[in-house]
């Protein structure tokens, strides 16, 4: 008798093969939206960098530095915390959500593909926003190598939180409401483009726990010299939010049948 060949569906080779397949699938599935995503990212980041300057008759140097170094963070936030939930909500509205989970790849591969695409997608808008902001305020920023882990940490945290929340919330309408709330809070009540000392104590204390201030500070530390203190604490805040988001994501993935 001839032994039947069986396909090994475990191990690093199978996982990496599924990861490459999901990357291709997701890129093809989102190809019509990627340019739109980038446009929104640039408009929110570079657009706010320009608009904030109109709040001053003459922008003081420190204020200009905060705006120019905070604007790139504003370009990162919408990718992870608005566009990722919107993409997941679209799957649910179009009744392809269950199909996504039925694909013959490990479920964590589906999450890893999304994390990779949206984290990388944050980079072009970040760069464009930084260039526009530096031009608008005529600044010579002290860009250092630490900007690389800063952008990756901030982007991964935002994508992780957006992905975990979007999958954990069953009703896409609620997801859409929360997305709009996040944008409202980030634009009006987050110390991203100005010092946290401008806030009352209770709101400043809240933002020391929320991720937005820490996102801005790790990015700002990679663009300036001596403006950010206690950088390790800010990375710890981002790491805590990322781990919590991954825990939620693992729970969501694990309970799918």
Where are these regions (language model features)?
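Short hydrophobic, aromatic-rich alpha-helical segments embedded in or entering the lipid bilayer
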Residues: 2-3, 8-24, 192-235
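Transmembrane helix-boundary elements of multi-pass transport/secretion proteins
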Residues: 10-15, 25-92, 142-147, 177, ...
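Hydrophobic alpha-helical transmembrane segments of multi-pass membrane transport proteins
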Residues: 47, 51, 64-136
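Transmembrane helix segments
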Residues: 56, 168-209, 213
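Alpha-helical transmembrane segments and their short interhelical loops
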Residues: 107-108, 112-179, 227-247
């Amino acid at each position: 008798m001839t032994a039947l060949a069986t396909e090994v569906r475990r191990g690093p080779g199978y996982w990496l093969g599924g990861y490459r397949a999901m990357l291709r699938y997701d890129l093809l599935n989102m190809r019509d939206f990627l340019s739109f995503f980038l446009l929104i990212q640039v408009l929110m980041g570079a657009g706010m960098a320009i608009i904030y300057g109109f709040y001053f008759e003459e922008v003081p140097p420190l204020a200009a530095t905060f705006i120019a170094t905070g604007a790139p963070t504003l370009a990162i936030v919408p990718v992870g915390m608005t566009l990722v939930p919107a993409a997941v909500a679209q799957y649910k509205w179009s009744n392809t959500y269950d199909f996504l989970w039925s694909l013959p790849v490990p479920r964590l591969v589906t999450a890893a593909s999304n994390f990779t695409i949206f984290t990388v997608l944050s980079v072009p808008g970040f760069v464009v926003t930084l260039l526009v902001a530096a031009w608008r305020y005529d600044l010579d920023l002290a860009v250092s190598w630490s900007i690389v882990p800063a952008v990756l940490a901030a982007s991964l945290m935002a994508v992780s939180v957006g992905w975990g929340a979007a999958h954990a919330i069953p009703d896409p309408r609620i997801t859409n409401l929360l997305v709009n709330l996040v944008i409202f809070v980030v634009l009006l009540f987050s110390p991203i483009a100005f010092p946290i000392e401008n806030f009352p104590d209770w709101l400043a204390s809240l933002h020391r726990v929320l991720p937005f201030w820490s996102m801005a500070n790790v990015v700002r530390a990679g663009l300036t010299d001596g403006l950010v203190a206690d950088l390790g604490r800010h990375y710890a805040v981002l790491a805590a939010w990322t781990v919590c988001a991954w825990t939620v994501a693992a729970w969501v993935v694990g309970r799918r049948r």
